[in-house]
A protein has these predicted regions:
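A glycine-rich beta-turn/hairpin centered on an aromatic-Pro dipeptide
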Residues: 299-340
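A structural supersecondary motif
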Residues: 253, 264, 338-351
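Phosphate-binding core of ATP-grasp and ATP-grasp-like enzymes
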Residues: 170-178, 183-225, 233-266, 270-278, ...
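ATP-binding N-terminal substructure of ATP-dependent carboxylate-amine bond-forming enzymes
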Residues: 1-96, 128, 301, 312-313, ...
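Active-site nucleotide/adenylate-binding loops and adjacent lid/helix of ATP-dependent enzymes
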Residues: 98-180, 186, 198, 222-237, ...
């Protein structure tokens, strides 16, 4: 039996685990902590920090792995690409390309050089230079760590006082101690997940992103996006341009973009599965298993039977269950108004568990199907509620 090294086993990695089992790999999984949701479905667990490239490289060598599968985290992407390059394993872009795509400062420099439609960004490695830049720039601005995901460390600023605090905060969150500062674009945020084969887009899943409790962490995704054919065409052209320049390998290429009256602006790209169990509604929308095909790509297996240009159908969404304060969970109650739309759910926490970062710590997810776009937005957006978790101090 061939061996696969999977870098983590969170709820977001369950689809990768299912795919590896379907492909009959012996699954060795790593992670900082034991007991994650997917660990029990794997064959072997080695407690190790998957962001430590040299440590994971030693594990890969000692276990004679045949393939490596990244997890739902950018640091996992770095490590998987690094090890694939060192050991000659299939399925990954070269390490330098991975760094370009998954570091905001490197990607923005690449975008500027190659005329990719992305906000102009300035990078900094010290607080003084960053603050001086803000002081002579027009507000509002947005300040981000270069190497964080899920909205970590990001803040909009409207004056010098806010800028100073946000710069300190972003540097605290960045492992690399680098940040970027950009003009704030006022528009609607969307996701555009594509699958590449031979550097061409052969499938897409589109969604609108909504953030209520935390403006920088997506809370609700609705599928498909409210999007014109022109916007879709522009984004496909941009992705294929990036893929051609960087000679990207097959597999998922996801981007987030903000659209205003001037069109779409690409704010972030990534080559991995998405958080918030994104593939659950995406699979239903597209009629195929995104995680399965992504796993085949990362394992270097044939994609000859990939369902190219498969039509999407239906209206789907996920809603993140969040607490409204820190403390201990008293009870979790799914609102009755969601029952008629509910197709699945996944809980990460239970009564008695603690919540320390309520604005960014998911309690679970609801997966829903609607009969129309209008119904979906009415129930989830226009009539938004966040009262399914009762807390005690």
């Amino acid at each position: 039996m061939k061996k696969a090294l999977l870098l983590c086993s969170t709820h977001n990695d369950l689809g990768l685990i299912n795919a590896l089992k379907k492909l009959e790999y012996y699954i060795i999984v790593t992670g900082n902590v034991s007991g994650l949701p997917g660990q029990k479905y794997c064959d072997e667990f080695i407690q190790a920090d998957y962001s430590d490239k040299e440590l994971i490289l030693d594990i890969a060598k000692n276990n004679n792995i045949d393939v490596i599968v990244q997890c739902c985290n950018d640091f996992g992407v770095y490590t998987a690409s690094y090890i694939a390059e060192k050991l000659g394993l299939p399925g990954y872009d070269d390490y330098e390309t991975t760094l370009i795509l998954h570091n905001k400062d490197k990607f923005k420099a690449f975008a500027k050089e190659n005329e990719i439609i992305s906000p102009v960004s300035t990078s900094f490695s010290d607080e003084v230079s960053a603050f001086e830049f803000c002081n002579r720039s027009a507000y509002p601005l947005i300040i981000k760590p270069t190497d964080c995901s899920a909205g970590n460390g990001i803040k909009r600023v409207d004056n010098d006082i806010e800028a100073k605090e946000a710069i300190q905060y972003a540097f605290e969150k960045s492992r690399a101690k680098r940040i970027v500062i950009e003009p704030f674009i006022d528009g609607k945020q969307h996701g555009f997940c594509s699958f590449l084969i031979d550097q061409k887009v052969v499938a897409v899943s589109t969604n609108d992103e909504y953030s209520f409790l935390n403006p920088y962490r997506v809370e609700i995704d609705t599928f498909p996006a409210i999007q014109t054919e022109k916007t879709k065409q522009i984004l496909v052209e941009q992705i294929e341009k990036i893929a051609s320049i960087l000679k990207l390998k097959d597999g998922i290429f996801h981007l987030q973009y903000i659209e205003d009256e001037n069109g779409p602006h690409i704010i972030e790209v990534m080559r991995r599965i998405l958080g918030n169990m994104y593939s659950v509604p995406a699979n239903r929308l597209n009629g195929f298993d995104w995680d399965y095909w992504e796993t085949r790509a990362r394992c270097g297996l044939s994609l000859e039977d990939f369902p190219k240009n498969h039509p999407s159908d239906g209206y789907f969404a996920y809603k993140t269950i969040l607490a409204s304060s820190n403390g201990v969970i008293e009870s979790i109650n799914i609102l009755s108004k969601y029952n008629k739309y509910l197709v699945d759910s996944f809980l990460l926490k239970k009564p008695g568990d603690s919540v320390k970062r309520f604005e960014s710590e998911p309690i679970g997810f609801l997966f829903l199907r609607f009969s129309s776009m209008e119904e979906m937005h009415k129930v989830l957006i226009n009539e938004y509620e966040n009262n399914m978790v009762n807390m005690r101090g």
